[in-house]
Amino acid sequence: MNGALSVTPLCQGTIDALIIACTELEKLTPHFPLMLDLNPRGTHLVVLGAGLTEDGKIRPVLEERLEASLRAAQRYPESPIVVTGGVPRNGVTEAQAMKDWLVARGIPPERITEESQSTSTVENARFTNDVLLERRATGAVLVTNRDHLERAMINFRQAVDARIPVAGIVAA
């Protein structure tokens, strides 16, 4: 079962040192973030890229993230999805490959927005924030691996500047 970081109000502030300290103290739970239950249409699932193989195929670490996002997407069918990651390999961006993977498993393509310009987690956060603003998101739930989640949460919380809450789901 995947876990989710709890959403502590202090972690959603505008002071970087407080965001970092608070995020480091958060704990994993066996539950999906509550904001998905309270407002599934406004809460976006954000799947973070993890690089592709040289021939443009999905690596195992990225497939773990996609499997976790698929479970969340099936449980919360009204939640929009953002797949984020550039770095093309063999003419395919991470975002394109992730969208294709999800669509092949039954997720409607119109439910998925691609952010395919980013080349780092900081850029994932910055460029995805633009998408979340445009779509008037009320929350974001990141989907990534355990060893990446804390850094990603910090980057996204800094990018959204306390406008919306950010939580996370751990893949496999």
Labelled PLM ranges:
Residues 1-2:
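N-terminal targeting leaders that direct proteins to extracytoplasmic destinations
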Residues 5-11, 18, 24-172:
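A structural signal for short, hydrophobic/glycine-enriched beta-strand patches
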